[in-house]
From Swiss-Prot:
Pfam family membership, one: Trp_syntA
Classification via Gene3D superfamilies: Aldolase class I
Keywords: Amino-acid biosynthesis, Aromatic amino acid biosynthesis, Lyase, Tryptophan biosynthesis
Catalytic activity, as annotated: (1S,2R)-1-C-(indol-3-yl)glycerol 3-phosphate + L-serine = D-glyceraldehyde 3-phosphate + L-tryptophan + H2O
Residues at the catalytic site: 50, 61
Protein name: Tryptophan synthase alpha chain
Gene name tied to this protein: trpA
Stored NCBIfam families: trpA
EC number: 4.2.1.20
Length: 279
């Protein structure tokens, strides 16, 4: 089965450019604003949307994304409302892939079978569940595959040759290479090392490789784009939204404009990089 993710990356490969994958937190700072951000992302240049599922104990996330999740939870965001966001987005956009990203606990509480049914009905194309290793594929990965939803794995600089085949087994959609160890929003990675890592992973898979963690500026995104099939930006977008909120996390400025202006700049930079490389 071909998903929107497969189709999108095939289109981009034909165009000779990498994807811009944009992450933001579902329900941050509130449901209405977050949905406006989501709907505005493709026009700003996002090729794939990662929709964060807020969770109270996000161990892999840095302070910015933790704060975004807390704002969303405080505003009443639930997994059902995050699925609602996907469904509402799909009423206007049937081509941009949606990948829900987060932790297993909210899905487990919601009910795996129910979640996959509702996710598919809402137009969700892929899942990234950061705390479910390949040894637990039977929990969610294999059921997701059967439901026609891509299950996207994370690889890191410490994923060795013995571990890599296990990580890639049952992976689909794309591979998310975490360009450094630690939490999201940390310092930028060494782009030469990223290039080496991507080439190494590609020896073991035909899936597109997207690189994230630590990409904050258009310049950094462009540097990563020369090595990868996609660049993932999350913390910078979350920070752009947060910069338009008051100390209580309520909207005081224009978070939609702040997010889309950044994404537009990132998209221009990413697209130009590959075009230059191809000339």
């Amino acid at each position: 089965m071909t998903t929107r993710i497969d189709t999108k990356f095939a289109e981009l490969k034909a165009e000779g450019r990498p994807a811009l994958v944009t992450y933001f937190m579902g329900g941050d700072p509130d449901l209405e604003t977050a949905l406006k951000v989501m709907k505005a992302l493709p026009k700003a240049g996002a090729d794939v949307i990662e929709l964060g599922m807020p969770f109270s104990d996000p161990m892999a996330d840095g302070p910015a994304i933790q704060a975004a999740g807390l704002r969303a939870l405080n505003a009443g965001q639930t997994l059902a409302k995050t699925l609602y966001m996907a469904a509402e987005f799909r009423k206007e956009d049937d081509t941009t892939p949606i990948v829900m990203m987060g932790y297993y606990n909210p899905i487990y509480v919601y009910g795996v079978e129910r979640f996959l049914t509702d996710a598919k009905a809402s137009g969700v194309d892929g899942l990234i569940v950061v705390d479910l290793p390949s040894e637990m594929d039977a929990e969610l990965c294999i059921p997701a595959m059967k439901a026609g939803i891509n299950f996207i794995r994370l690889t890191t600089p410490t994923t060795d040759d013995k571990r890599l085949p296990k990580v890639l087994h049952n992976s689909s959609g794309f591979v998310y290479y975490v360009s450094m160890n630690g939490i999201t929003g940390a310092a930028i990675a060494d782009t030469a090392k990223v290039g080496e890592a991507v080439r190494h992973i590609k020896k073991s898979t035909d899936l597109p490789i997207c690189v994230g963690f630590g990409v904050k500026t258009p310049e950094q995104a462009a540097a990563i784009a020369t090595h990868a099939d996609g660049v993932v930006v999350g913390t910078a977008i979350v920070n752009a939204i947060a910069g338009e909120l008051d100390e209580k996390g309520k909207v005081k400025g224009d978070p939609v404009a702040a997010a889309t202006q950044l994404v537009h700049a990132l998209a221009e930079s990413v697209r130009a990089t590959r075009l230059e490389a191809a000339q």
